[in-house]
Amino acid sequence: LEVISSLNPIPGTIVKEVTKMEKMLVRGVTKDNDVARISIVGLTDVPGIAFKIFSKLAAKNINVDIILQSVGRNNTKDIAFTVSKDNAPIAIDAIRELAFVGDDTPITCDTDVAKVSVVGAGMETHPGTASKMFEALFNSDINIQMISTSEIKISVLIDAKDADRAVAAVHEAFL
């Protein structure tokens, strides 16, 4: 089928059968070893804490990727997020500058992590994509520390030592 304009003699758009590549939901698997996870434990569970933390990091020009906030309990919550390894010390110093973060507030930084992602179009409208990725990691005995999703990407944070095995397992599952 060709869709053309009756007013313009140029060739139109050919509509044809979907190819195997067009049927593939996941188009690639990526790995990022330049990642650090920062965790802040026991923050008071009140409005504005996340805003204050992440606006402070933005003011220092620190890009934040994956963010995880725990469900509040006993009027406290934990926040963990990832930044580049180079920005981790700057991020920790910036957080320590905040008035509500005391010297005794536990802040940890783990640089022995990696981010593995599957990339493709329309993932949020295809049930089971995340499950398939998580199954591939489970079958390879790889623990997931954090998860982030978007319409085109599902990312997990894992131990850096498992990154190459994770890429291979996820690649095998999808591609």
Question: What kind of region is each of these model predictions?
Answer:
Residues 1-149, 153-175:
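C-terminal catalytic "cap/lid" subdomain
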